[in-house]
Amino acid sequence: MKDTSRPVTVARTVLLVLGVVDVVRGVMHTFVLTWAAENIAQIAPHPDALMLLGLFGNSNLLTGALFLLVAFKAREIAGYILGIIPVAYFVGIVGIRLNGVSMQSEFTGKYMMLVYFVVCIVTFVYFVVAGRRKSKHN
């Protein structure tokens, strides 16, 4: 039987929305690459940058599909997935910084990603805290 408790439902819904967001990001990074680079990320459309952006689009399509799959087939773990997302990106950012790489472009997508991470963290904390309260009352 599927868990329909409020924390699970909230986490599932947020993961579902993020899945759709990632699919849209994947389509933009993969199929409208130059337009997205110039108009959204505001980075120079250098061929190497576009190649990396396109490859990142592939991973966006993958994560979007996996988030949707979890939301529909394994809703009980949706909250944990939301906790893993910012940790994975943080590890990636640490690796980038350790290699001395820094952005030179405006990269306006960072504001959307900040909201993305805050939503993940707030929902994960709610999922864990509400889940613990529920288990104490049972």
Model-assigned labels for residue ranges:
Residues V20-M51:
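Hydrophobic transmembrane helix segments
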Residues M1-D22:
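Cytosolic juxtamembrane helix and N-cap/initiation of the first transmembrane helix
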Residues V20, P47-L68:
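Core segments of alpha-helical transmembrane spans in multipass integral membrane proteins
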Residues Y80-R97:
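Hydrophobic alpha-helical membrane segments
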Residues G64-Y80:
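Juxtamembrane helix-break-helix junctions at the cytosolic face
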Residues I40-A44, M103-V115:
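Non-cytosolic membrane-interface motifs at loop->transmembrane helix junctions
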Residues F117-N138:
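Membrane-water interface at the C-terminal end of transmembrane alpha helices
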